[in-house]
């Protein structure tokens, strides 16, 4: 049974309250590094990405540098990450697209971001919200799992349905905080196996609604 909008908002706001200082866990110093790091994070932990990116960014600090590298040269820096050969191919192509289509700058709109090789809706939403402060809500595995476990969405909901539901429940200024807090909540409490959410009764207390 999916929660009402009021109850779902209560759950999300309680999760934000549990992790009010949640920040992005990927390391980056500019928009290009953020884009690359988020692309690398697919099916890989942020911790693993953060171990790989210092060497990668030192070797290829700009789209220009990455575009002229070979796929093997890029792959050698990310070989411990999942799907690293595909990611190397996407990074090289994406870097060239940034030069050809966007004067070497990372674009700010979802349509433009999703035109880049290897960039899907989730990556675009992270770059928009974290990199540019543009309201967007990214759905990763933690967010999807939490929303289904807590009946914010139906169990069969797609990532896009999760995204639209949360954006309908919370005001835009809370979307990024909710995304960050849910990642921390998913890692620390709402595990895929043996979630510990029941230790936080405020998540289930709707007596004041």
Outline where the language-model segments fall.
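Catalytic cores of DNA base-excision repair glycosylases
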Residues: 2-209
């Amino acid at each position: 049974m999916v929660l009402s909008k009021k109850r779902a908002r209560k759950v999300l706001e309680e999760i934000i309250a549990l992790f009010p200082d949640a920040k992005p866990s990927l390391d980056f110093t500019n928009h290009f590094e953020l884009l690359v790091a988020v692309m690398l994070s697919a099916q890989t932990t942020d911790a693993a990405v953060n171990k790989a990116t210092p060497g990668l960014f030192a070797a290829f600090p700009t789209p220009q540098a990455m575009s002229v590298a070979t796929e093997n040269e890029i792959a050698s820096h990310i070989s411990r990450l999942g799907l690293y050969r595909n990611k190397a191919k996407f990074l090289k192509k994406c870097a060239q697209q940034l030069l050809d289509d966007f004067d070497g700058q990372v674009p700010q709109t979802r349509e433009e971001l999703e035109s880049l090789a290897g960039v899907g809706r989730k990556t675009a939403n992270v770059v928009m919200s974290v990199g540019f402060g543009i309201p967007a809500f990214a759905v990763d595995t933690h967010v999807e799992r939490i929303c289904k476990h807590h009946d914010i969405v139906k169990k069969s909901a797609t990532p896009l349905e999760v995204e639209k539901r949360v954006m309908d429940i919370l005001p835009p200024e809370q979307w990024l905080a909710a995304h960050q807090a849910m990642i921390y909540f998913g890692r620390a409490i709402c595990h895929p196996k043996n979630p510990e959410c029941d230790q936080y009764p405020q998540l289930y207390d709707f007596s004041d609604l």
